[in-house]
């Protein structure tokens, strides 16, 4: 028997739970400079476009990118996240396909740029889904088109005997905790972001299957893509052995 690990991951679960608070938590004023730099980075790599965002969510990056004149298409599994995007100014400018980005193809291609940010690639539950995603991305790119990914570099020292409980922040009367279980064989971390406050207890699932940059590069090679850039952040910071995140660019050869 070949162990498969726990793959009961619903692609819509994260977004359906978090949609009401996502922008309040992650689309905050202090993050605006980083969004602006990320949009600049993407703008300079989109060529003649169009662009496709995997896991477009509430449009945190897609909307400012579209506002700068790029045609942006998105895929997302969560109807509630997409409803948030639709309600925003410019929301009707971004076409969104509802579905799993490892499986569905978006209309409007081939794309000059496909991108996936904020660790969203790791939402795919296992290596097979991640390999399929790379293959679909490669098939949807124009010759010379680019695939950009922003993701964390795994750090398994975070876990003590396969678990971690972390106080994330105190927000007024509300305490934010993160409770995680780590499976190093399948490279999975199942987490629950818990909020404890006057309104009661909130629980938000965040389940990921992480991969090191070297494994992502191998997925790229399997899909016929070549790594052309790797930075530690959107500002072009050098990527080193101590970097905790990366912005990587793979290219479909001409
Ligand atoms: C962390 S949010 C990022 C949203 C947006 N890209 C941003 O930067 O704010 C992850 C998004 O990916 C979506 N998602 C997660 N797994 C997915 C999958 N397998 N297929 C499609 N969308 C998925 C979620 O619904 C959510 O909207």
Q: Would you name each region that the model predicts?
A:
Residues 112-128:
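A short SAM/SAH-binding and catalytic strip from SAM-dependent methyltransferases
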Residues 1-57:
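Conserved class I S-adenosyl-L-methionine
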Residues 148-219:
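SAM-dependent methyltransferase
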Residues 59-104:
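Class I SAM-dependent methyltransferase SAM/SAH-binding core
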Residues 211-254:
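C-terminal lobe and adjacent flexible extensions of AdoMet/dcAdoMet transferase-like proteins
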Residues 105-113:
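A short acidic, Gly/Pro-enriched loop at the edge of an enzyme's catalytic core
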Residues 131-143:
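A short glycine-rich, Lys/Arg-flanked "PGG" loop and its adjoining helix->strand segment in the class I
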